[in-house]
Amino acid sequence: GGIPRHAFGIRERGTLPQVGDNLGIPAAQAVAERLSQGMLSSKHGGGVVGSSAGVSGFDLIKRLLEVPKSAAGNATVAHTDGSVTSIQDAPQGGKYVFIDNERHYVSPDNTLLVNAGDKVEAGDVITEGYPNPAEIVKHKGIGEGRKQFVDIFKKALVENGINTQRRNLEILSRGLINFVRITGNEELSGHLPGDLVDYDSLSEIWKPRQDSQVLHPSKASNKYLEKPVLHYSIGTRITPSVSSNLKKFDVPEITVNDSPPPFEPEMIRAMENLSKSDDWLVRFGGTNLERSLLDSVHRGRTSDLRGNSHLPSMAIGEI
């Protein structure tokens, strides 16, 4: 779950980070400070430029972090692979876009980005505006979801007159988008079906299944990654766009399986992130403390004082 010091780059003091440095705290602080300054400036300056169906400023940032299941003006995301078979006027206004006969509603506030005959993949954004990041994570996986979240969040900040380094957003996305839901019928590393599990922790102990194959990306269409490659995470489906990107970076082979792994990606709202941690001390930084503590006792959860979170060390007075 750590970050190589050279991958992070030079810090604000002009040196590479030391092994053991917590990079999440300064990254979150840098983003929060810029956000606060931007909101104060907009308050005294008469608003901000840039919106998505009337949503802008702090409301837009909050929407991207809290990922409500439905919100007026959200960009439409394709739920399936296929071709755009037809585009029809909706009686309530807006459009119906049919992708292989599956209907997608497009708000009249959003401009279509596809035409009849276009091919799309599940998770593609088919209108202008800001999509719900959770939908992208659901269809494209943890890794691609993190990447697109950074792009979306960066765009939202810039359009509202706020700038920050991309690497800070990358660290933020890694913390926010890091859960999978166990879907198999059997226990997986101590977790039961339906459990929400930390992806980084699970990926460290995950071993490719016995019937997995090592193939060239061009021969792995519609199979599922068993080992991470580039920014793509375990369980990512090899679609034409994924295959094309792997070819672009000269990836010679990947480990894949015909079936998805027994878990699926799930992005939860930022406010619930800490309370869903596997570490019982980290949970004390979240909400619903009584329920979290009782669940931790029931599951026999432990705490790692040398883990990625600063909260356990803070709890025992080390920092």
Positions of PLM-derived features:
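Intrinsically disordered, low-complexity regulatory segments
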Residues: 1-319
